[in-house]
Amino acid sequence: MRKSSMWLITLLLLLSFVLVACGGTETTEPPAEQPVTTDEPIEEEATPEEMAEEATPEEMAEEATPEEMDEEGGAAEGDCASEEVLCVGLVTDVGRIDDRSFNQSAWDGVLRAQDELGAQVEFIETTEATDYQNNIALFAENGYDIIVTVGFALGEATIEAANQYPDIDFIGVDQFQGEAVANIAGLIFAEDRAGFMAGALAGMLTQSNTIAAVLGTDLVPPVVAFKEGYEAGAAHVNEDINIISTYHPGGLDVAFTDPEWGATTARQALDQGADVIFGAGGNTGNGALIEVASAEGAGESLYCIGVDTDQWETVPEAHPCLVSSAMKLITPGVFDLIQASQDGSLPSGNFVGEVGLAPFHDFEDQVPQEVKDTLVELDAGLRDGSIETGYNPGG
């Protein structure tokens, strides 16, 4: 897809030719950009949040847009005000779009909408929690049809924006909806079930009977659910298990973007005898996985388990130890809700996505068949309710 910034380059080139031909010396200020579309998760050019430092959403909406520069007068690519164009914007929580975990999984769902539905897409990376509302408004004021907000912490800002912009559909990833709002779908997951499966795998693979979990902050309910499920699953299959679970001590602004702390905490767990470590905390958890992968015995006597997505695909540095991942199927969940919005059937309230374990990949032959069979039985029990994780969100 062409980026909106190409219009600026083309305009400047045309102006330079005209000025040279006419012998003029004055220059013309180009119109300000609005959020641009992209094919790639990472942009080198100015981002919408950088633009926000210079103008409010309302000012950006009033300024000239790339569509207004279309010399043929038609709806140019990027014309989100056109009913013929589906525009989808994504706002991350504090952290990068390429976190190789939570944010990236949601963005992949948006990119799938670009490929399969012809949507024009863009993201904004949040750098400060105080920017939530303004980042959402950047998309809303520029005519975006669907806005995806990623993470529990954006829940309040998403509800406020949905009430302010009732004609825009919102998808709140990991945002439980206590009261349904007509234009919000909360994409939620049973993280305790995914954690239970990861814990059961760890409890059956361990030789030392000590396993660990390196986690994001307990201020985020899904992280707590992963941890509680992990511990319950391990205890379900191994009554002698010893579990070392550690939450990041920082707030939402740092708890998921601290791979150094993740690595240090994983090393401490290894030193205490843990031989299977679950990394569940965005890039912080990735640091734990990579630390285990670099340790002596990785893949033979030491294993690690990823989170949110199949991290075999996103964290290749963890391959030496990465036996599986506790997955929330965020990518298909986001895509399905975007498609529902396009069809005019976005479900209000909560939409429960699927969870499960990722494939074993290179460890397929190392995982005993008995372990695989037990995991199948546990998954079936969790689904039919005969097995419970014991996790109580209100408890």
Segments and roles (model prediction):
Residues G23-T25:
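Intrinsic disorder/low-complexity signal
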Residues T27-G395:
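A residue-level marker of the well-folded mature domains of exported/periplasmic proteins
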Residues M1-I9:
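Bacterial N-terminal signal peptides that target proteins for export
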Residues V18-A21:
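C-terminal motif of bacterial Sec signal peptides marking the signal peptidase cleavage site
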Residues I9-L15:
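Hydrophobic helical h-region of N-terminal Sec-dependent signal peptides
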